[in-house]
């Protein structure tokens, strides 16, 4: 791996994070007002709250943003602490949608229909439409829609750039040893939590893991604990937003953290026992884009059931 590959990797990462930020901000502006009304009205029971949290987070692609809104609603008295719990649970599952979208980048079939599903096939068109709307749109809604499309195209281009740049890492012994270390579940959880805390987005963190999977050195045994840690790291944003709020709003942020920490402890313990006793072969297999998306969803669903 040359210095140019490193620079390409850094550039791809920057484009990916920038695109996700632009898309997320534009989605919140485009639908934020309506979604806030939905959040405040459709949370009278746990199931309604759960479905609302899932739906809102699927739209704005950020469980952190949804949870921050929930903390604000609890602080203002619009939502009770009890109502917030269902929304937080739904938000945790809604955030997995991003990984499923990114997993389309791993399609390698020669089938024309499957090829059309690859983001590299349609993102140039989205970028063109987004540019036209952003430059020539008269209303703020059209401009925001343009920003959403451009943001999505940018993050997918960044993802593709990262995937191409990291391919050379597969032959570097130090990189191979690094992911062998991450097979230690505790270390994997810590790495996932720290990375997500730094970039403030579990979706982006999972996307980076998906890009690294192209090397073939990321096993499911290493990926699963990292995914668990990513769910803990994403709680930091809500905790920070709760500073200066009332007691119940702080409790809502703590509920979010507790929900993910307890879920991680329970499932990590089970995962470690299964790994040590049964040694399933799948844990040694190389993770894929789709496999990581599936693992991310299954873990969040399992935490919600718990």
Regions found by a protein language model. Give the residues of each.
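Membrane-interfacial helix-loop connectors
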Residues: 69-84, 88, 99-121, 159, ...
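Structural signal for the N-terminal portions of transmembrane helices
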Residues: 116-120, 149, 249-262, 281-306
């Amino acid at each position: 791996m040359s210095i140019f590959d490193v620079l390409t990797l850094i550039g791809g990462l920057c484009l990916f994070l920038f695109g996700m930020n632009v898309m997320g901000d534009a989605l919140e502006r485009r639908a934020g007002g309506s979604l806030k009304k939905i959040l405040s009205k459709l949370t009278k029971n746990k199931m309604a709250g759960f479905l609302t949290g899932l739906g809102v987070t699927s739209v704005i692609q950020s469980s952190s943003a949804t949870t921050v809104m929930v903390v604000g609603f609890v602080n203002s008295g619009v939502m009770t602490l009890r109502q917030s719990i269902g929304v937080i649970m739904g938000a945790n599952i809604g955030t997995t949608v991003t990984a499923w979208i990114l997993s389309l980048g791993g399609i390698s079939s020669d089938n024309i229909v499957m090829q059309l599903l690859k983001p590299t096939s349609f993102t140039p068109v989205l970028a063109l439409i987004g540019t036209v709307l952003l430059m020539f749109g008269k209303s703020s809604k059209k401009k925001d829609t343009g920003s959403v499309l451009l943001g999505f195209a940018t993050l997918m281009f960044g993802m593709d750039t990262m995937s191409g740049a990291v391919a050379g890492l597969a032959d570097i012994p130090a990189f191979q040893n690094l992911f062998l270390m991450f097979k230690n579940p505790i270390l994997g959880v810590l790495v996932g939590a720290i990375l997500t805390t730094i970039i403030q987005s579990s979706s982006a963190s999972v996307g980076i893991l998906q890009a690294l999977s192209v090397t073939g050195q990321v096993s499911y045994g290493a990926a699963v604990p990292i995914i668990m840690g990513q769910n803990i790291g994403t709680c930091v944003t809500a905790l920070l937003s709760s500073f200066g709020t009332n007691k119940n709003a702080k409790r809502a942020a703590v509920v979010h953290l507790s929900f993910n920490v307890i879920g991680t402890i329970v499932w990590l313990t089970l995962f470690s026992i299964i790994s040590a006793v049964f040694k399933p072969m799948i844990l040694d297999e190389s993770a894929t884009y789709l496999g990581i998306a599936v693992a991310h969803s299954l873990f969040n669903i399992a935490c919600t059931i718990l």
